[in-house]
């Protein structure tokens, strides 16, 4: 039995079940390399067309790798830009401003606004315009004397499937994720532009992107060589820069005939559909079966914050059913509630105290259970097993994307990847394992060792502002 998951003081039955679970969640390095290769196949097929089998959506953006030059020009001109993030449910938005000044740090302001009783796209955009006006006045973003000279560019970003219809416009494609229905087929730039005009605001929408694209742009501002971005939030997504001439599905367009490298929103959550390479466990199948989008976003359900805690809860309830954890007279009803074990609880894998006090405090406060030292070890082990499986899967997927991004370069060089999202601050072991795995599999694919940068929880609102400078 692996000593990594041997529980001190546990019975043979307890240790045996922990090890059985660890074995089922274990993935060899060779299998991870195969997964990376499959991701590469899915990307290649996705660039061919939207109806290809074994393909990721690979949504093409008008944002180009050369946006670093556009940002550099904006710095020279001491430009101002606004960024707007709209969340999936249209109940919350974040606004940011970026102002470049000579010989001093960039001036960045951020503010969150709540949306109320949004029943349609027009109402959403009108509320957004009102909040933008409030933001401009509160932070004095646009000096009064310059408001009649030139509109301030506004970049909009949203964490939904987005088809960019022009350099400034984009329509949300509501896929299997829950999103407000009125998003479907609405051109956000046109809708918001009309609302801004209605309020006589000196602001013009110049770009509309998915959050994973604006995250990559934000990363380029700090690390100009960035070619790939990974978001680890409630869901998962990744983007990279691809040679426009290597994208068959846009070959007849002006963009497809250019020499530019353009941003690709991979929609990585979809990976694994039409494939058996991921080999989900019975607990993963249970999560999928009980989800609102059964059969979709297969990869996301194995690795994303939204689902990791629920996988752990299902494992704990199996221990409960076998009467191998917690006192028999304990009230464990909370554990029976779906999604009651939040993924944020999995930070307990970092508890290094001799008695695992943090684990015990969590179980007492969150579930009203006085857990023994053995119980605490079991719960921490289950969190670690689930988190490390997820991190290794993500690392393998990133390696596959790195291979594709490297092939798109004019001259191959070490790939620079930025990671953003809640998990970068919430679960350091997860992020570290993701990076280590990506480097390991990249080496197996004979790629130069990639460079990783952590962008933090929210880079995409500032990235949206920077995207507005795109030419």
Task: Identify the residue ranges that each predicted region occupies.
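Conserved catalytic-core segments centered on acid/base and nucleophilic motifs
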Residues: 84-86, 96, 206-207, 219-220, ...
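Small-residue (GG/TT-enriched) beta-loop-alpha framework at ligand/catalytic clefts
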Residues: 22-67, 206-207, 213, 228-231, ...
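Conserved beta-strand elements of beta-rich interaction domains across eukaryotes
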Residues: 87-91, 100-102, 159-161, 214, ...
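Glycine-rich phosphate-binding loop and adjoining helix at the ATP-binding site
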Residues: 112-133, 162-222, 227-228, 244-270, ...
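ATP-binding/phosphotransfer module of carbohydrate and carboxylate kinases, centering on a glycine-rich
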Residues: 1-110, 114-152, 197, 222, ...
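Short glycine-aspartate micro-motif
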Residues: 79-85, 153-155, 227-231, 237, ...
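Intrinsically disordered, low-complexity regions enriched in proline, serine, glycine
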Residues: 96, 106-107, 145, 165-167, ...
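Gly/Ser/Thr-rich active-site cleft segment
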Residues: 147-195, 199-204, 224, 234, ...
């Amino acid at each position: 039995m692996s000593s990594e998951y041997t529980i001190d003081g546990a019975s043979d039955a307890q240790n045996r079940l922990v090890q059985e679970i660890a074995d089922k969640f274990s993935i060899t390095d060779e299998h991870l390399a195969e997964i990376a290769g499959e991701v590469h196949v899915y990307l290649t097929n996705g660039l061919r067309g939207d109806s290809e089998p074994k393909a990721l959506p690979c949504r093409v953006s008008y944002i180009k790798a050369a946006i670093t030059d556009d940002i550099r020009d904006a710095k020279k001109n001491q430009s101002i830009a606004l960024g707007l993030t709209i969340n999936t449910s249209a109940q919350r938005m974040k606004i940011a401003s970026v102002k470049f000044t000579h010989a001093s740090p960039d001036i960045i302001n951020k503010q969150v606004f709540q949306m109320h009783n949004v029943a349609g796209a027009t109402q959403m955009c009108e509320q957004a315009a009102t909040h933008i006006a409030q933001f401009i006045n509160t932070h004095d973003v646009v000096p009064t004397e310059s408001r009649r000279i030139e509109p301030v560019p506004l970049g909009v970003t949203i964490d939904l499937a987005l088809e960019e219809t022009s350099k400034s416009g984009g329509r949300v494609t509501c896929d299997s994720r829950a999103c407000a229905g009125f998003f479907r087929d609405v051109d956000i730039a046109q809708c918001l532009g009309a609302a801004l005009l209605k309020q006589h605001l000196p602001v013009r929408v110049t770009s509309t992107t998915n959050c994973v694209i604006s995250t990559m742009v934000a990363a380029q501002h700090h690390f100009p060589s960035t070619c790939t971005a990974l978001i680890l939030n409630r869901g998962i997504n990744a983007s990279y820069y691809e040679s426009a001439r290597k994208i068959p599905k846009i070959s007849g367009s002006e963009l497809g005939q250019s020499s530019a490298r353009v941003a690709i929103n991979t929609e990585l959550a979809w990976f694994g559909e039409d494939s058996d390479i991921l080999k989900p466990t019975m607990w993963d199948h249970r999560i999928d079966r009980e989800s609102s989008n059964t059969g979709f976003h297969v990869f996301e359900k194995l690795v994303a914050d939204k689902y990791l805690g629920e996988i752990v809860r299902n494992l704990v309830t199996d221990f409960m059913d076998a009467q191998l954890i917690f006192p028999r007279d304990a009230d464990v009803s909370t554990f029976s509630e779906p999604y009651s074990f939040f993924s944020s609880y999995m930070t307990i894998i970092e508890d290094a105290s001799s008695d695992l006090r943090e684990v015990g405090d969590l179980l007492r406060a969150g579930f009203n259970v006085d857990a023994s030292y053995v119980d605490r070890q079991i719960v921490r082990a289950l969190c670690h097993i689930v988190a490390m499986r997820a991190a290794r899967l993500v690392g393998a997927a990133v390696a596959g994307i790195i291979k594709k991004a490297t092939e798109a370069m004019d001259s191959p060089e070490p790939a620079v990847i930025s990671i953003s999202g809640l998990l970068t601050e919430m679960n350091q072991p997860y992020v570290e394992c993701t990076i280590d795995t990506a480097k390991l599999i990249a080496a197996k694919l004979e790629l130069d060792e990639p460079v990783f940068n952590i962008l933090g929880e929210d880079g995409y609102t500032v990235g949206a502002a920077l995207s507005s400078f795109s030419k």
